[in-house]
């Protein structure tokens, strides 16, 4: 079952990197991903979180993809992965007040790692993320961004397989 495999991958990733939450954001057009059309919406399709963390997947459904524009740009400009520390959130607020409000006020997020999920035609089809309260507990020297990108590649393959069934 694809959902079980995805949850297992997210659980392992979340625990390995000591994150409070790990999730997969999928881009879509209404009810399905239509080939060769620009994506308009996104959902938090899969989510795994630590025991004391409240799920947010119910708050992240059918949102306009334009909200994630800065994240998508940063992912593309940074070889498929981007880290936002709480100290950089002010810069994000200047670039995209809507995204800042969504992350900070609606979801209460302060530190994130986003990695791009790519389809077989190398288009961005989604994002996998790790969420942290405090990066200082987990310095970047133990967070292997290359490994996160490798794991994202496995998640991409699972999403591609799901879209074919």
Which stretches of residues belong to each language-model region?
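Well-ordered, non-membrane alpha-helical segments in soluble/globular domains
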Residues: 3-9, 68-69, 145-151
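Regulatory sensory and allosteric helical modules in signal-transduction proteins
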Residues: 43-105
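Short, solvent-exposed, Trp/other aromatic-anchored flexible loops in extracytoplasmic proteins
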Residues: 107-110, 129
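Intrinsically disordered, low-complexity terminal regulatory regions
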Residues: 1-52
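Residue-level signal for short segments within beta-strands and strand-turn junctions
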Residues: 26-28, 119, 132
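A short, aliphatic-rich beta-strand micro-motif
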Residues: 110-119
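Short glycine-/small-residue motifs
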Residues: 114, 124-127
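Juxtadomain coupling helices with adjacent low-complexity linkers
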Residues: 126-165
